[in-house]
């Protein structure tokens, strides 16, 4: 194995620690802090000349601080003559701003971030469940987008008390993801929630395509933000006779009123991964369970360093 160096910012310290343990490689010695005026301070405290360096840093909230930490760390390592620098970004912030809506005068911020990372000296990006896969094309360097679904599916398969389970897509846009999950769950049945607003200033109506009566529903998505739409979906499923509702998502964004929304009894359990640390408020709910992606990300790092196939990790 080449000389691998692992470094971590302040966004996901526990995930970084787990990855380092899986690889039997200690995290690199670096100072990542703040100057008295709030500017980011980075210093690499060990030799990285010619090394294959991986920086583990989600760009979750505080998004701008974590993104800037990553960028400054890349620059510090580049100036220290690192051989190759891979940004391991388990959760890629700004991924939802991936296109202009109609003729709106808005930026494509995902492209801005991609340009920023490329220009500062990142040689490769490893990320997980991009909100829009086309973001890979925004970069001028290779991007490996791995999937959290195998970890989520393995957990679902361990639920021995599921009654007549059915996979549910929370919207039309998530049908491909839900279908893939349903296929891996022994071709489980699937339902779709079709959200429509009949006319302006009228509440959104949720139509459920599929029979969920007396069934355990498994809602799958790439991320949960405020959880408002998720709760409405769970309520609609319960109103249609669903027995229980479980929500599975890779990224636990959990912003704004998420804690209040997730406390809604319509949701029986929420299962996420550790790409984003949970706040104390969310942990106090005792309804949210976290799975780790450390083994998968560690294996991806090993394969990248050894020039092995990443896609082979997900071959059926």
Swiss-Prot record:
EC code: 2.7.6.1
Cofactor note: Binds 2 Mg(2+) ions per subunit.
Reaction catalysis annotation: D-ribose 5-phosphate + ATP = 5-phospho-alpha-D-ribose 1-diphosphate + AMP + H(+)
Recorded superkingdom: Bacteria
Keyword Transmembrane helix carried by entry: no
GO biological process, one term: purine nucleotide biosynthetic process
Annotated residues for binding of ATP: 37-39, 96-97
Keywords: ATP-binding, Cytoplasm, Kinase, Magnesium, Metal-binding, Nucleotide biosynthesis, Nucleotide-binding, Transferase
Residues involved in D-ribose 5-phosphate binding: 197, 221, 225-229
Pathway(s) this gene product operates in, as recorded in its UniProt entry: Metabolic intermediate biosynthesis; 5-phospho-alpha-D-ribose 1-diphosphate biosynthesis; 5-phospho-alpha-D-ribose 1-diphosphate from D-ribose 5-phosphate (route I): step 1/1
Record InterPro entries: PRib_PP_synth_CS, Pribosyltran_N, PRibTrfase_dom, PRTase-like, Rib-P_diPkinase, Rib-P_diPkinase_bac
GO cellular component annotations of the record: cytoplasm; ribose phosphate diphosphokinase complex
Enzyme class, UniProt record, top EC level: transferase
Family statement drawn from the similarity comment of this UniProt entry: Belongs to the ribose-phosphate pyrophosphokinase family. Class I subfamily.
Protein function: Involved in the biosynthesis of the central metabolite phospho-alpha-D-ribosyl-1-pyrophosphate (PRPP) via the transfer of pyrophosphoryl group from ATP to 1-hydroxyl of ribose-5-phosphate (Rib-5-P).
Name of this chain's protein: Ribose-phosphate pyrophosphokinase
Organism: Haemophilus ducreyi (strain 35000HP / ATCC 700724)
Gene label: prs
């Amino acid at each position: 194995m080449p000389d691998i160096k692992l470094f971590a910012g302040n966004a996901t310290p526990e995930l970084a620690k787990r990855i380092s343990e899986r690889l039997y490689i200690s995290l690199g010695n670096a100072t990542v802090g703040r100057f008295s005026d709030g500017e980011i301070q980075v210093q690499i405290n060990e030799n990285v000349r010619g090394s294959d360096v991986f920086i583990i840093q989600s760009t979750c909230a505080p998004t701008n601080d974590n993104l800037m930490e990553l960028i400054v760390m890349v620059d510090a390592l580049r100036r220290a003559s690192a051989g190759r620098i891979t940004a391991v970004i388990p959760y890629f912030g700004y991924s939802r701003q991936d296109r202009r809506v109609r003729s709106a005068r808005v930026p494509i911020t995902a492209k801005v971030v991609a340009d920023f990372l490329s220009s500062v000296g990142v040689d490769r990006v490893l990320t997980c469940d991009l909100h829009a896969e086309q973001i890979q094309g925004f970069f001028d360097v290779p991007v490996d987008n791995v999937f959290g679904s195998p970890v989520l599916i393995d957990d679902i398969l361990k639920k021995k008390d599921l009654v007549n389970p059915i996979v549910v897509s929370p919207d039309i846009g998530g049908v491909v993801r839900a279908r893939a999950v349903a296929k891996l769950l022994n071709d489980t049945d699937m339902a779709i929630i079709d959200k429509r607003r009949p006319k302006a200033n009228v509440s959104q109506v949720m139509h459920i395509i599929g029979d969920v009566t007396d069934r355990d529903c498994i809602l799958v998505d790439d991320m949960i933000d405020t959880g408002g739409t998720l709760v409405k979906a769970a309520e609609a499923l319960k109103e249609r006779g669903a027995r229980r509702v479980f929500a599975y998502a890779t990224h636990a964004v959990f912003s704004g009123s998420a804690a209040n929304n997730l406390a809604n009894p319509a949701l029986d359990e929420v299962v996420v991964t550790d790409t984003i640390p949970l706040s104390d408020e969310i942990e106090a709910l005792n309804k949210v369970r976290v799975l780790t992606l450390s083994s998968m990300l560690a294996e991806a790092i090993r394969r990248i360093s050894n020039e092995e196939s990443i896609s082979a990790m997900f071959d059926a």
